[in-house]
Amino acid sequence: METKQVLDRIRQRAKDVLPQGSSLYLYGSRARGDAHEGSDWDLLLLLDKPKLEFEDFGKYSYPLMTMGWDFGEDIRVHTYTKGEWNDGPHPMFYFNVEEDKKVLYES
């Protein structure tokens, strides 16, 4: 599937399932433009709430991840609250993502 088609589907799913105040970013090789065939799709999902709950993964992360199964793409979703992300979860991961992230969806 073409990159634009995958991104359009991700954006539509985000619009359908994510709550108000959410942000979804693409990072990694797909964001930098140096992906190869078979590269995964790295997504960062930030939720505007004080604390993540178990249900958040089933309601928000899982629908984004599983949509890739329908068209043979590996979509990986890393989910944090905005507060957790701004406090810097793991410095190397944080800087890696911040360096090349692209906005896919914000509400």
Located regions from the model:
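Catalytic core of pol beta-like nucleotidyltransferases
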Residues: M1-Y25, R32-E37, D48-S107
